[in-house]
């Protein structure tokens, strides 16, 4: 059974834009992306929207629907009342390219800043082994489809553009946490990097990133909070503290 519903779709580019009202047919079983495609086909032939798999596994169609970051391909029209106006806008934290398409290159830049996995120097192909519990501990994080909705909803980025230079965001702090807990990774400075370079201290664990994750990854509880705890343990470790005092005293004597 079909029905006519009201949509408000953001149209424009980085210089100017606004919401456009449109009435469109909605059929049983459809998702928001289906309706956007119908609007493209019948009323707005030049409407720009990014999408790919239409199965909730590529993260391409992330946008804000009624003010909340969602995947358009996974948001069912049956969740809206017939009289409700569905407002569709681009992800607010990133610059608009056109219409519903945003420039998410900020995330690619942050990904490149994260040092990659560093295996033991003397290891040969096929020699590395891990306990199953270590494999399972970080398996959750690898479910990420890079929709960047966690990045978009994080208020440190969303409300403070100036923080982007010094804050990696929940998606890439999660990556730092994953590598830091990897038993075979040889880098020992990941906690320092997370705190001093990638802005872990900016996160105040509101869990908004966890709430919007379409893969239901517990970003805050299983990645960010444990990483914060390890950073604190390292900074206030009594042996490390005593060692730093001794070294500082020796430096003073030498000078």
Where are these regions (language model features)?
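Ferredoxin-type iron-sulfur electron-transfer modules in oxidoreductases and energy-metabolism complexes
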Residues: 30-42, 89-255
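Short strand-turn-strand beta-turns centered on an Asx-Gly dipeptide
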Residues: 10, 64-67
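Active-site phosphate-binding and catalytic loops of NTP-dependent enzymes
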Residues: 44-50
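Short, structured protein-protein interaction patches enriched in aromatics and acidic/basic residues
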Residues: 53-60
């Amino acid at each position: 059974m079909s029905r006519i519903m009201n949509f408000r779709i953001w149209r424009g580019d980085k210089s100017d834009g606004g919401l456009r009202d449109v009435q469109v047919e909605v059929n049983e079983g459809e998702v928001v992306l289906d309706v956007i495609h119908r609007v493209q086909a019948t009323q707005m032939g030049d409407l720009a929207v990014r999408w790919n798999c239409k199965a909730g596994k590529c993260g391409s169609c992330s946008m804000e629907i009624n003010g909340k970051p969602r995947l358009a391909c996974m948001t069912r029209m049956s969740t809206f009342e017939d009289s409700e106006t569905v407002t569709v806008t681009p992800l607010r934290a990133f610059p608009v390219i056109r219409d519903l398409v945003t420039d998410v290159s900020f995330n690619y830049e942050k990904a490149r800043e994260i040092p990659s996995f560093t295996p033991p120097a003397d290891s040969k192909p096929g020699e590395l082994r891990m306990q199953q519990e270590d494999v399972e501990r970080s398996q959750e994080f690898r479910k990420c489809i890079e929709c960047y909705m966690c990045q978009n909803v994080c208020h440190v980025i969303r409300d403070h553009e100036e923080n982007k230079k010094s804050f990696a965001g929940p998606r890439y702090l999660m990556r730092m946490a994953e590598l830091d807990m990897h038993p075979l990774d040889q880098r020992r400075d990941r906690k320092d990097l997370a705190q001093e370079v990638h802005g872990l201290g900016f996160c105040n664990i509101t869990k908004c990133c966890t709430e919007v994750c379409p893969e239901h990854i517990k970003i805050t509880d299983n990645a960010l909070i444990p990483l914060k705890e390890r950073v604190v343990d390292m900074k206030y470790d009594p042996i490390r503290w005593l060692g730093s005092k001794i070294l500082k005293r020796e430096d003073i004597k030498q000078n």
